[in-house]
Regions:
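Basic, Lys/Arg-rich alpha-helical nucleic-acid-recognition elements, primarily the DNA-binding modules
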Residues: 27-62, 67-70
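Acidic interhelical loop/turn segments
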Residues: 47-58, 127-154
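C-terminal interaction segments
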Residues: 227-273
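Short, contiguous alpha-helical
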Residues: 55-96, 144-200, 239
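Short, helix-capping/interhelical loops that line the mouth of catalytic, cofactor-
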Residues: 23-30, 77-134
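Short linear/disordered segments characteristic of secreted peptide precursors
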Residues: 8-14
Length: 273
């Protein structure tokens, strides 16, 4: 399951696009617009479900579709609180000796409710969260699960989580859920947190170049120094699925090269578990 965080703001400094590029107003706002669009896509799927379908088993282990949406609601409530007040105020923070997955699962089990209540709670929470992040000081970091993030980076994690859990919901339902250009934010997040993921696993935090084909099949999204010895290439959709642990790297068409490419592909994440 995981709670979606770019683990350290030092490794996930805000850009919304490529690391190292200046942030203009349009780039700053695009992440919020794209987060809203991703949430609206999920809302359309959920609005058509009957009560029985809410109880279907999702692709998130141990959770029904209603459980997944409840988790998203709880996470958005926490995001709204931190974007407004700068801290989680007793939300989904993790205590010593507890994993994020365990904390999230416990929170869901404590607050299960009827599907209509869960759906309405998520709708309120996601609207409040998006409004709070838009209104927040763009340069002032706020507390998130295991570190501090600027609001646009926080929004990127919310986009990553809604997209991945959207896959968890759409798959069992057989709902249409095509890849979109919004994956660029998620791919950026996955690449930007690679140094942390590598170092935590005891691997050298060496530069890794990612060259990813966008969903339109024409654009190529490039992250990382062009002269990096290690690289990952392939479809952006597969890269994002691997980072979300929705696809085994060995079953993807992604190619890793150089001394650290294979380790980077194995360890890439858009969240901390």
């Amino acid at each position: 399951m995981g709670l979606w965080v770019p683990v350290e703001d030092a490794l996930a400094e805000e850009s919304g696009l490529l690391a190292g590029r200046p942030v203009c107003h349009s780039a700053w706002m695009s992440i919020f617009d794209d987060l809203g669009a991703e949430q609206e896509r999920l809302e359309k799927i959920l609005s058509g479900l009957d009560e029985a379908q809410w109880g279907w088993v999702s692709a998130a282990q141990g959770w029904t579709i209603a459980d997944v949406v409840l988790h998203l609601a709880q996470s958005e409530e926490a995001a709204a609180a931190t974007a407004t007040h700068g801290n989680l105020r007793g939300g989904l923070g993790v205590v010593a000796g507890e994993t994020m997955d365990a904390r999230a699962d416990a929170a869901v089990r404590m607050e299960r409710a009827a599907p209509a209540e869960v759906f309405a709670r998520w709708q309120r929470a996601r609207q409040a969260s998006l409004a709070a992040m838009r209104a927040a000081d763009p340069d002032l970091p706020v507390q998130w699960m295991v570190g501090t993030l600027k609001p646009a980076t926080l929004a990127t994690t919310r986009l990553a989580e809604h997209w991945a859990h959207g896959l968890d919901i759409a798959g069992p339902l057989g709902a249409d859920f095509p890849d979109t250009a919004r994956l660029r934010h998620i791919a950026w997040l996955a690449h930007r947190t690679l140094p942390y993921a590598l170092s935590v696993a005891g691997e050298p935090a060496a530069p890794v170049r990612c060259e990813l084909t966008a969903p339109d099949g024409e654009q190529v999204w490039r992250f990382g120094p062009p002269d990096a010895e290690s690289a990952i290439t392939g479809a952006a959709g597969e890269f994002c699925r691997v980072a979300a642990q929705r696809l085994d790297p060995a079953r993807s068409g992604l190619a890793a090269s150089g001394p650290h490419g294979a380790a980077a592909l194995r360890l890439v994440r858009t969240y901390a578990a």
